[in-house]
Amino acid sequence: MKRYLFIIVGLLFLVGCSTKEENEKYAYLEYKNDLESQDVYDEEDSLDFDTYFNIIRNKDDNEKVDYSIVIDKPEINMYNVKALLVHDYMNEDAFPSVGIFDDPVTLRKDSADKIKLNGTINTTADTGNINFKLYLEYTDDSGEENKIYYEVKRG
């Protein structure tokens, strides 16, 4: 009898873990699809934070292009921040994110808090025509949920 009880508890544990992972994967895909289908983006001067985008060919491996975006200097407190950075280059890998597969973060006004999303594109081709888009979701001091769709301007 103890053996069956042990097996049942083990199965319930496995089902619980896979359900959480499935929910995270579903949320990630929902954010990604929503961002990729977006036609209207927030203007840079309307953002309540600064962004710095960087893209550079990897020094150690010429077939890789490293890219990153830093989100910092918020003008307001930003709680439960979730962010996803995508691009339109063919890619099988997951895009960099925060707050979707891990715990959401907080950016506080007048602090050194920042978010950095890093990714890599495996290519030797020119990357000058790749478009990058950022989705950012957060709650402000009044409890209002904000969603930002931002197209990264390059050059």
Question: Model-found features: residue ranges?
Answer:
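Positively charged n-region of N-terminal signal peptides that target proteins for export
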Residues: M1-Y4
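Short beta-strand elements
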Residues: G143-G155
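Short, solvent-exposed, Trp/other aromatic-anchored flexible loops in extracytoplasmic proteins
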Residues: A94-S142
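N-terminal export/targeting and maturation segments
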Residues: S18-F95, I100-F101, S111-A112
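Hydrophobic residues positioned within well-ordered beta-strands of beta-sheet architectures
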Residues: T51, V65-Y67, V81, L117, ...
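Sec-dependent N-terminal signal peptides
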Residues: F6-V9
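C-terminal motif of bacterial Sec signal peptides marking the signal peptidase cleavage site
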Residues: F13-G16
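Short, cysteine-centered beta-strand-loop-beta hairpins and adjacent loop/turn segments enriched
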Residues: P74-N77, D140-E144
